[in-house]
Regions:
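Phosphopantetheine-dependent thiolation modules in NRPS/PKS and related acyl-activating systems
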Residues: 1-39, 43-94, 98-105, 109-135
Length: 135
């Protein structure tokens, strides 16, 4: 299990989660766990998320997208608001081939994932990076 999924599972006090887990439907869901996820996103992943935005999130994939966008914004040196799940390599000037490789190299230790060499050409969007997490 990668670092992000483990963090979410720990906050939710469940054995494991997948990207498609609807986190509000986990056993024992309560406002304390919601607060725990908000704190985790901000403190552990550098992704401060307001309550209104948090209420829009449904799955662990949505939480992961928030964390990955904050991470990518730091690597690319762009505002978080300029990125979304659909943002692709080359769609903004800062996401060039060099920064694309930086995203791959820095995401692996940060998120505890491994992108096999043959998958890297397929990592075109933020959501592609998340979907390719090997768990």
């Amino acid at each position: 299990m990668n670092k992000f999924l483990k963090s979410v599972a720990d906050v939710l006090e469940v054995g494991s989660v997948t990207l498609d887990t609807p986190f509000r439907e986990t056993e024992g869901w309560c406002s304390l766990k919601a607060f725990g996820l908000l704190v985790m996103l901000e403190n552990d992943w550098g992704a401060p998320t307001g309550i209104d935005r948090f209420m829009e999130l449904k799955t662990v994939r949505d939480l992961c997208r928030e964390a990955f966008i904050a991470f990518a914004a730091g690597v690319l040196k762009v505002p978080r608001e300029s990125l979304s799940g659909e943002t692709a390599c080359g769609s903004i000037p800062e996401w060039d081939s060099v920064n694309h490789l930086r995203l791959v190299m820095e995401a692996e230790p940060k998120f505890g994932v491994s992108y096999p060499l043959e998958t890297i050409p397929g990592l075109k969007t933020v959501d592609d990076f998340i979907s390719a997490f090997l768990v």
